[in-house]
Amino acid sequence: MTPRRRVAVKQLPLQLKSGQVRDFLRDVTPLLTGDRPCIVFDFSQVTEIDSAGVDMLLHCMEQAMKQNGDLKLAAIPPSSAVILELTRVDRLFEIFATVSEAVDSFYGFSVPIEQPA
């Protein structure tokens, strides 16, 4: 039996803006540089996101993919979901209603939220 890959869940800060993004990137970089990282970003506390936050998400996705890993998003509040939709970033990520669904998806137990056409 193949061992289950470890999934890291990272709570995003209240505001995904330039100052907070730098601090968050410093904390999350070790997770992104490991072999085949499996990461879930928990959006449940996020109240604001700007272009620096969107850029950070794209950077983290790119770094995870370079290591043959994956980054998934979970528990996105409506105000943040609008930003991700307007920037079309929502099309690049698997997005889940809850963190547990996102974690389970790494093991084949869950289905992402349907994105409207």
Predicted regions and their residues:
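Generic signature of intrinsically disordered, low-complexity, basic-rich segments
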Residues: 4, 48, 60, 101-104
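Short, aliphatic-rich beta-strand segments
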Residues: 5-14, 42
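Amphipathic alpha-helical interaction surfaces in cytosolic regulatory modules
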Residues: 15-93
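A charged, well-structured terminal subsegment
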Residues: 97-117
